[in-house]
Amino acid sequence: MTEQASSSAAGAVRSRVDRTDIAAAVLIACFVALALHGVWGQDATSDERHYFGAGLEILRAHAWTGYGARLHPPLSYYVQSLPLVWLGESSPDDPVALFPCRATSLLVFGVPLLVVAFRWARELCGPAAALVALALIVFSPTVLAHAPLLTPDVPLAATGTLALYLFHRADHGAGRPWGWGLALGLCLLSKASAWLFAAALVIDAVVMAWRRRDRGILLRVAAGVLLSYAVLLVGYGFNGLLDTKGKTELIARVPDLPLARTAAHIASPFFPLPYLKGVATQLGVGWGGWESYLVGELSRNGWWYYFLVALAVKETIACLLLLAASLIAFRWRQAGREELLLLLPPLLFFVVFSLGRVQIGIRYVLPAFPMMFIFVSSLARLRERWTRVAIGLLLAAHAAAALRASPDFIAYFNELAGGSKNGYRWLADSNLDWGQNLTRVRAYARERGIAIEPDVLPSTGLVAVRANRLVGIGDPETYRVLRETYDPVDNVGYNWLIYDLARKRGSARRQ
């Protein structure tokens, strides 16, 4: 009788696991379909024009001469350029070349990200939590918007999540470091801000070593970090590692920030010159600032609350409610090592970028989203029936919001912002207008015979203006009259606003 009961229980577990895996496969297939639908026929974004084909250029010339190639480490460039090996050199304006490159990036980085998040959540909180975490990522408009793009944001999310997951599997540094060390190396090769993942890992290891009174953890973590450093060198082909002249010239151009040049002197002998150039470029941009837009204001210094506002209007309301519920339900005094490892990356990304001067898109904190969603999935452990029903309803609402937003995921804004049609009132740049709908607006304008961004507004008729120019980025005066006197009568992809100059607003009001 006992054997029969055990066999029945084991069969039930296998059946549940099988159902969970099938559900996960369906969700991943939905993610791929939605993401590819989002970029089908979409123009290359501003950043993609810099990065397109950069990997092929680097491999052929063994040099980082292009502007895009100097901005970030090369892993995403290598992978995203793979189709061009067969298609040959092309242009980002050629959809025959652009779409395969985007699909490759999605399959190599986006899909593994989902698999890792699913497995991590299942190991921590069970199969129900795994599906919660997976659904949150799959139907996140932000993730769907950026997963297929030829940019390093989702590659960083994928490699960073993998590194921390393998670190978790290695008992937070107490186990062998080879797996997470290799993954951390790939993470460092993904984007300059990968050091935030490395910092989270090291902080977690230090806490673990202190709690266990085990210095051996620090030695094993040091070995893993050295392995990641070796992967970084190989990824750059050791290019410029011994170029002392180039490094000396670079240090002289490092922004005069506190300790920046001292740090550059210390680090320069150990890193490839192209990597140092990328870091210096990012520091220069970060120190000089970038014109940002937030709720009717322009600034080159940014706002400490920019990314909090961006999260509040760029993710679905259902997702925000689940996030709030997880923070309220979490027993902070009983926080363990797993919670620490999940919470550190979101905390570091939001704090560091909120203090910075480059605030042009929620994508800067996107790499921390998977850990945030895995943390939220812990709600699935609550046993009350009503909580499970509520979670299911909120996930359904989350998915419905993403489906309604398709294919315009970049321009998604939730109901708190008044929907995507009012996104331009809140944010701009890569949150909304990244050059993705130029072909669509040209077709729209041809059909209706309207002007696109005229330098001088006509006295009557229809005009189309993209959101970035409308809100005044780079030129606050040309379209001031539209902002203050008119409301749009239509839009194309939400980032191009259509105005009828014969229909003024009832009273002048600053938008």
Summary of predicted features, one role per range:
Residues 1-9, 288-290, 295, 396, ...:
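C-terminal luminal/periplasmic domains and tails of membrane-associated envelope-modifying transferases
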Residues 26-28, 324, 334-354, 482-486:
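Transmembrane alpha-helix segments characteristic
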Residues 28, 221-230, 331, 335, ...:
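Signature aromatic-anchored transmembrane alpha helix within multi-pass, membrane-resident enzymes
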Residues 45-46, 145-155:
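Short acidic/glycine- and proline-prone juxtamembrane loop motifs at membrane-interface regions
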Residues 103-124, 162:
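Transmembrane-helix motifs of polytopic, lipid-linked glycan transferases
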Residues 133-138, 165, 184, 188, ...:
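Short helix- or helix-capping micro-motifs
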Residues 163-177:
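Membrane-interface transmembrane helices that cradle and orient dolichyl/undecaprenyl
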Residues 310, 315-336, 388:
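Hydrophobic, aromatic-rich transmembrane alpha-helices
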